Amino acid sequence: MDAPRRDMELLSNSLAAYAHIRANPESFGLYFVLGVCFGLLLTLCLLVISISCAPRSRPRTPAPRRDPRSSTLEPEDEDDEEDEDTMTRLGPDDTLQGQELSTEPDGPLSVNVFTSAEELERAQRLEERERILREIWRTGQPDLLGSGTLGPGATATLGRMHYY
């Protein structure tokens, strides 16, 4: 007889809580938001503590590996560079092999990103292409899709420039 009484007690308490929430939705909303904020604050504190207390390990610097393809490079023709696509695609073998981090306590974090002169040259070409594209967009080249006949005396705005 004790089990049905507990079930009825749970049901009546649940109904009483539901009736209280329906009668006071503002207090329920306030408690809910306070709970969410407290949880986020607690998570942030634990994250900061775990980051600050994490042991600092020295990164191992692997022995520099020579790429067997680098010794058999053919000289590139300058005309071929112009025909290339604006994006340089890297294959699975062209990934960066080693990143060396210096962990000086007061100094800045320096990263050696490029492991060969070929990768450095490739990155410089890509950066130059991106700079040229940004400059083209900045100067506001006219949009050719909107250049139809507008009739006499009409004005049109193409891209960022105003044409009369």
Swiss-Prot record:
It is a single-pass membrane protein. Belongs to the EVA1 family. The chain crosses the membrane at residues 29-49. This is Protein eva-1 homolog B. It is found in: Membrane. The gene is Eva1b. Signal peptide: none annotated. The modification Phosphothreonine is found at residues 86, 149, 157. Residues 74-85 have a biased composition (Acidic residues). Keywords: Membrane, Phosphoprotein, Transmembrane, Transmembrane helix. InterPro entries: EVA1_A/B, EVA1_dom. One of its GO terms (cellular component) is membrane. It comes from Mus musculus (Mouse). Residues 56-110 are annotated as: Disordered.
